[in-house]
Amino acid sequence: MDVSQQEIAAALTLIDASLTNCENAQRRLKEGTASHSLSVHRIKALRIASTLLLHETRAFTPDELAAARVQLLSIRSKSETGLAHAQPGSGTHTRFSRIIAAMNTVLIHLDAAMEAHA
């Protein structure tokens, strides 16, 4: 499936905003807690996603890609749950729709990178 440059740009914008939000939230989390660990893994996954969308030449191990995939699928799944409860046309509905679209775009690139390692 081909992804347009517009979809990539939208995904990058959302990922950059999510990274900033996660990094800011992480500062308030106590190290060693489950929330802190989740934040660390999510930030790493979002950085990998950004790198893949920018077509930067950085080699990721299959394990790094697999771990990122788990986190990105989790973000998409939680967003799908939120979308199901959001009022159509609301800001929340729009936000979750954009997150889901961005994760779908990223997962296409991530799956291609994983296939390249296979």
Task: Map each language-model feature to its residues.
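Terminal, compositionally biased segments
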Residues: M1-A9, T13, R98-A101, T105-A118
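Intrinsically disordered, low-complexity linker/tail regions enriched in Pro/Ser/Thr
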Residues: D2, T33-L54
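Charged, low-complexity interaction regions
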Residues: N24-S37, R58-P62, T81-T94, E115-A118
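Amphipathic alpha-helical coiled-coil segments
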Residues: A45-P62, T81-H85, A102-H117
